[in-house]
Amino acid sequence: MDYIYTPKLHIKMKIQFDVLRKSRELILKELEGLTLDQIHVTPEGFKNNIAWNVGHVVVTQQVLHYKMSGLNCLCPDDLINDCKKGTSPTKTFTEEEFDEVKDLLMGLPDTLEEDFEAGIFENYDEYPTSTGLVLDSLETAIVFNNFHEGIHYGIIRAIKKFV
């Protein structure tokens, strides 16, 4: 679906970028005080751990926004393979590796907004989500991604109670 860039669309999207940045800040805050061992614990009743969830939100945002627009993702392929939809934790991050994931977590929202404003997203491959929603534009993908990150923020908070 083609969208005409208008000031009204810009304002609505600015709010979405702000929501994305805020969700990332909240996720990062949940990591405070946790050890490397704690973020890799998968409590009974859960399918994944905190480290995987953090990697997953980074990867999903990149796949939904960049890959589905026919562009290269801005995170490493290894991270995508380890944390994409349908995977479970197999990777144990070193402190340095997880710091890199946290840097991506916090830096990529600004890059997305800059790229959006620069108009690099010219195409979007329709994507049916597992929720039944069909993403047909970058704008709908950004809104959906914010919903998705809220889910994983809640999962991180729940796991944190058990580690």
Label the predicted regions.
Residues 1-12:
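N-terminal amphipathic/basic-hydrophobic helices that include classical n-h-c signal peptides
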Residues 2, 17-21, 28, 38-85, ...:
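Short, contiguous alpha-helical
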Residues 10, 17, 21, 54, ...:
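Generic detection of long, well-ordered alpha-helical segments
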Residues 20, 24-27, 31, 105, ...:
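Hydrophobic alpha-helical core bundles mediating ligand binding, dimerization, or RNAP-core interactions
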Residues 33-40, 114-125, 161-163:
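Surface-exposed helix-capping loop/turn segments at secondary-structure junctions
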Residues 34, 48, 93-96, 136:
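Short coil/turn linker and secondary-structure boundary residues
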Residues 86-124, 140-145:
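Acidic/histidine-rich alpha-helical segments that form the ligand environment
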